[in-house]
């Protein structure tokens, strides 16, 4: 299949704003590819439509900056870099600049190699593998080779794929529905089956292949796999402790009637400390243990102490466990955790791992078990999963778990050290502190304990529900002090002035909308330290899509945790809301835009804020 044919589909999809029309166009494309090309091309096409050449769980990226892509365009076409930058600035899209350059190319390719979908895909995957001296030049040469053989339209989408900005308006939901329409009956059940398979594989290409070849039975067979991480189940914000306890307490009659389950804690909720750390999944298969973040990044090398703790204090050889990695200051005399920003240094550093592990030791707080000895536990109730979890944790690891009759957060302070000499003084693994509660009083006391121990708040969970990866579910709630921070996506930033003129700052902040787009809710003017400003600039500079004056439009990829005074109604931003005095809490290295807070949540916080104000004034 010629890449230009796929580029034409891209153009048609980008031209319509109607979701159903996008789904129809993609469904037709997927069917045509499956019926008229080699079978292996369907998963490649589906992945490229999402602007990717790797699955989310693969630890790889194309890794070419916009500047590198611009150099490749110039090399392929002979057009001066200054002209390419002019087009880029005028159009706000380096892909458009590539199309203009190919159309206006100075040098012509005499013996062009056919530009197929397979060639583009395999070349971009190869580009990501280059390392060491001269790797950047090799990357640019390979991309220039693709552009040299491309039409203007094909060049536009090659460059957009390289820079991670397809501009198709196609999210995971549209691809899901297109697959359900193409290969199933497009009922709600069909779309749900495709979504379940995507959640369990984190690879839409694998799902496409299965549903095309095997239909519904192929999706039903999809299950958890070791070393293929899944997205976490997320909790909704609770209006109050009382509301959460009332709504989530397991109704024994409902459970027995609808699920044939007997609960040991009928009418109760599970309450856990909410830790401000790195959410992680620990996979073990025999001697091989891997650690993954909520963004599915493999951070095993950065956390050898976590690996050692898991090996020594989890009595099983095949499992997937979920935990929170919480950092501590070894020089401190208490267990107050370090900030997430400090802990995040451990993800960012891949050198001197032993040194930084000792300077920022972590405790691994285990709170869920998703698979054990080859058996997926996702459909089991939370209570059943925790019972299985307790059977494989060492005595010391479970000693920190809270009983329903104990609420002093400092009463269990034993530290479980690992056997490895290198990390013996700094590693621990504990069961997340938790209790069962049937009343608001019990829950409120435990919440105060969590805050007193320096943690974020509490999680309140219905014990009778399964694990649903990738979803923000209503049967788990989080409670933190108000106004709690929002996780927001950076869409624009401005070059600073004076001594900080080399840095980008003052970012515009956006939340997710129901249709998968972004809506801005404010702009941050303060809150960066010099170190944070440098880190922020290094993170967003490769994401620049367009520059007007001192303002840069960015590919939405960076998420910030933002604190603020209040939420106001505003016509300044397209969300209809504005944050008053937003300030940086931390750069969320562990969070991607799909996990940012929603406009619905901003609206709910505004309504709750208004209600609180009216009650205060009475």
From Swiss-Prot:
<dbReference type="GO" id="GO:0006273">
    <property type="term" value="P:lagging strand elongation"/>
</dbReference>
<comment type="function">
    <text>DNA ligase that seals nicks in double-stranded DNA during DNA replication, DNA recombination and DNA repair.</text>
</comment>
<dbReference type="InterPro" id="IPR012310">
    <property type="entry name" value="DNA_ligase_ATP-dep_cent"/>
</dbReference>
<keyword id="KW-0479">Metal-binding</keyword>
<dbReference type="GO" id="GO:0046872">
    <property type="term" value="F:metal ion binding"/>
</dbReference>
<dbReference type="GO" id="GO:0071897">
    <property type="term" value="P:DNA biosynthetic process"/>
</dbReference>
<dbReference type="GO" id="GO:0006281">
    <property type="term" value="P:DNA repair"/>
</dbReference>
<keyword id="KW-0132">Cell division</keyword>
<dbReference type="InterPro" id="IPR050191">
    <property type="entry name" value="ATP-dep_DNA_ligase"/>
</dbReference>
<feature type="binding site">
    <location>
        <position position="272"/>
    </location>
    <ligand>
        <name>ATP</name>
    </ligand>
</feature>
<feature type="region of interest" description="Disordered">
    <location>
        <begin position="396"/>
        <end position="422"/>
    </location>
</feature>
<dbReference type="InterPro" id="IPR012340">
    <property type="entry name" value="NA-bd_OB-fold"/>
</dbReference>
<keyword id="KW-0436">Ligase</keyword>
<dbReference type="InterPro" id="IPR000977">
    <property type="entry name" value="DNA_ligase_ATP-dep"/>
</dbReference>
<feature type="binding site">
    <location>
        <position position="472"/>
    </location>
    <ligand>
        <name>ATP</name>
    </ligand>
</feature>
<keyword id="KW-0234">DNA repair</keyword>
<feature type="binding site">
    <location>
        <position position="478"/>
    </location>
    <ligand>
        <name>ATP</name>
    </ligand>
</feature>
<dbReference type="InterPro" id="IPR012308">
    <property type="entry name" value="DNA_ligase_ATP-dep_N"/>
</dbReference>
<keyword id="KW-0227">DNA damage</keyword>
<keyword id="KW-0131">Cell cycle</keyword>
<dbReference type="InterPro" id="IPR022865">
    <property type="entry name" value="DNA_ligae_ATP-dep_bac/arc"/>
</dbReference>
<keyword id="KW-0547">Nucleotide-binding</keyword>
<comment type="similarity">
    <text>Belongs to the ATP-dependent DNA ligase family.</text>
</comment>
<feature type="binding site">
    <location>
        <position position="294"/>
    </location>
    <ligand>
        <name>ATP</name>
    </ligand>
</feature>
<dbReference type="GO" id="GO:0003910">
    <property type="term" value="F:DNA ligase (ATP) activity"/>
</dbReference>
<keyword id="KW-0067">ATP-binding</keyword>
<dbReference type="Pfam" id="PF04679">
    <property type="entry name" value="DNA_ligase_A_C"/>
</dbReference>
<dbReference type="GO" id="GO:0006310">
    <property type="term" value="P:DNA recombination"/>
</dbReference>
<feature type="binding site">
    <location>
        <position position="367"/>
    </location>
    <ligand>
        <name>ATP</name>
    </ligand>
</feature>
<dbReference type="InterPro" id="IPR012309">
    <property type="entry name" value="DNA_ligase_ATP-dep_C"/>
</dbReference>
<protein>
    <recommendedName>
        <fullName>DNA ligase 1</fullName>
        <ecNumber>6.5.1.1</ecNumber>
    </recommendedName>
</protein>
<keyword id="KW-0233">DNA recombination</keyword>
<feature type="binding site">
    <location>
        <position position="324"/>
    </location>
    <ligand>
        <name>ATP</name>
    </ligand>
</feature>
<keyword id="KW-0460">Magnesium</keyword>
<dbReference type="GO" id="GO:0051301">
    <property type="term" value="P:cell division"/>
</dbReference>
<feature type="binding site">
    <location>
        <position position="279"/>
    </location>
    <ligand>
        <name>ATP</name>
    </ligand>
</feature>
<dbReference type="Pfam" id="PF04675">
    <property type="entry name" value="DNA_ligase_A_N"/>
</dbReference>
<dbReference type="InterPro" id="IPR016059">
    <property type="entry name" value="DNA_ligase_ATP-dep_CS"/>
</dbReference>
<keyword id="KW-0235">DNA replication</keyword>
<dbReference type="GO" id="GO:0003677">
    <property type="term" value="F:DNA binding"/>
</dbReference>
<dbReference type="GO" id="GO:0005524">
    <property type="term" value="F:ATP binding"/>
</dbReference>
<feature type="active site" description="N6-AMP-lysine intermediate">
    <location>
        <position position="274"/>
    </location>
</feature>
């Amino acid at each position: 299949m010629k890449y230009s044919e796929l580029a034409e589909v891209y153009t048609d999809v980008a031209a319509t704003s109607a979701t159903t029309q996008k789904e129809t166009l993609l469904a037709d494309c997927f069917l045509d590819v499956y019926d008229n090309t080699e079978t292996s091309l369907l998963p490649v096409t589906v992945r490229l439509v999402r602007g990717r050449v790797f699955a989310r769980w693969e630890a790889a990226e194309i890794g070419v900056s916009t500047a590198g892509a611009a150099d490749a365009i110039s090399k392929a076409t002979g057009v001066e870099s200054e002209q390419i930058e002019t087009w880029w600035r005028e159009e706000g899209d380096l892909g458009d600049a590539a199309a203009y350059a190919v159309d206006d190319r100075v040098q012509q390719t005499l013996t062009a190699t056919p530009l197929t979908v397979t060639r583009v895909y395999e070349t971009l995957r190869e580009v990501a593998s280059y390392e060491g001296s001269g790797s950047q030049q090799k990357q640019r040469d390979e991309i220039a080779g693709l552009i040299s053989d491309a039409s203007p339209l094909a060049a536009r989408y090659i460059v957009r794929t390289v820079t991670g900005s397809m501009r198709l308006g196609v999210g995971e939901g549209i691809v899901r529905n297109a697959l359900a329409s193409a290969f199933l009956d497009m009922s709600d059940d069909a779309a749900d089956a495709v979504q379940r398979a995507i959640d369990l594989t984190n690879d839409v290409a694998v799902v496409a292949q299965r549903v095309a070849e095997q239909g519904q039975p192929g999706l039903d067979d999809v299950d958890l796999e070791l070393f293929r991480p899944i997205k976490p189940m997320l909790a909704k914000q609770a209006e109050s402790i009382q509301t959460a306890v009332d709504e989530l307490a397991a109704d024994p009659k409902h459970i027995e009637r609808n699920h044939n389950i007997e609960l040991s804690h009928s009418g109760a909720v599970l309450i856990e400390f909410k830790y401000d750390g790195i959410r992680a999944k620990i996979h073990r298969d025999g001697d091989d243990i891997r650690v993954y973040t909520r963004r599915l990044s493999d951070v095993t090398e950065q956390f050898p102490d976590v690996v050692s703790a898991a090996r020594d204090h989890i009595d099983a050889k095949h499992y997937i466990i979920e935990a929170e990695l919480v950092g501590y200051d070894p020089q401190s005399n208490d267990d107050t955790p370090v900030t997430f920003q400090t802990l995040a240094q451990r993800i960012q550093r891949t050198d001197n791992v032993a040194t930084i592990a000792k300077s920022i030791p972590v405790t691994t707080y285990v709170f869920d078990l998703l698979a054990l000895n080859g058996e997926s536990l996702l459909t089991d109730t939370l209570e059943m999963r925790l019972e299985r979890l307790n059977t494989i944790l060492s005595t010391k690891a479970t000693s920190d778990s809270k009983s329903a009759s104990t609420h002093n957060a400092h009463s269990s302070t034993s530290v479980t050290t690992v056997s490895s000499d290198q990390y013996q003084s700094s590693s621990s693994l504990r069961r997340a502190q938790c209790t069962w509660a049937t009343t608001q009083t019990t829950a409120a006391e435990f919440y105060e304990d969590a805050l007193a121990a320096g943690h974020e708040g509490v999680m309140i969970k219905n014990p009778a529900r399964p694990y649903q990866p990738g979803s923000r579910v209503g049967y788990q709630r989080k409670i933190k002090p108000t106004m709690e921070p929002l996780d927001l996506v950076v869409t624009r930033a401005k070059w600073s002035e004076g001594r900080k003129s080399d840095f980008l700052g003052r970012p515009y902040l956006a939340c997710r909308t129901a249709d998968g787009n972004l809506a801005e809710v404010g702009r941050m003017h303060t809150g960066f330290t010099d170190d944070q400003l440098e880190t922020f600039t290094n993170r967003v500079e490769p994401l620049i899509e367009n520059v007007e004056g001192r303002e840069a439009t960015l590919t939405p990829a960076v998420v910030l945790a933002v604190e603020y005074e209040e939420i106001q109604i505003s016509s300044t931003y397209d969300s209809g809301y504005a944050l008053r005095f937003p300030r940086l809490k931390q750069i969320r290295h562990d969070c991607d835009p799909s996990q940012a807070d929603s406009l619905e949540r901003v609206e709910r916080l505004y309504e709750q804020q208004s209600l609180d104000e009216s009650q205060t004034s009475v």
